[in-house]
Amino acid sequence: MCGDRNWKDASLIDSCLMSLVYDIAVNGGGPLVIIAGVAKGADSIAEDRARYHNIELDLYPAQWHLYGRAAGPRRNQQMLDEGQPGLVVAFHDDLENSKGTADMVRRAKKAGVPVIHVSHKNPGGDRLTN
C-alpha cells in the first residue's frame, strides 16, 4: 500500500484492507502481507490498521540520510523487488500531480503488478492498466 503523505482517512484504508481480507478468505490465496514504505499519511495509516487487524507487515523505510532525494524511488523499487507484491493499492486524491505515489504506481505497472487507485472521488478504486 502506498499513498499521499497528507492522507488522513483511516476508514477508507480500513475498508480496503477488510475487502482484501474478505477476497482472500472467499477466493483463496494469501497470506495477506501489507508492504509499506514507512511514510506519513496513507502508509502509516495502513501500517496502523494492519497491526490492529493482526495482518503481517513488511516495511521498507526510505534511507534519506544515505540517498537524499533518490531514497524514495530507491525504496519504491526495493518494495517491488524484495516484497514481490501481487497488488499495489495507491491512496491519493491527485495522483497525476503526485511524486512518490505516482512513482510507485509507474514502477508497479512497469513490473506487471496490478494497481488499484483509491481516491475520495472513487472510494471503490479504479484498476489501472499497465
What are these model-predicted stretches?
Residues 1-5:
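Short, hydrophobic/glycine-enriched beta-strand segments
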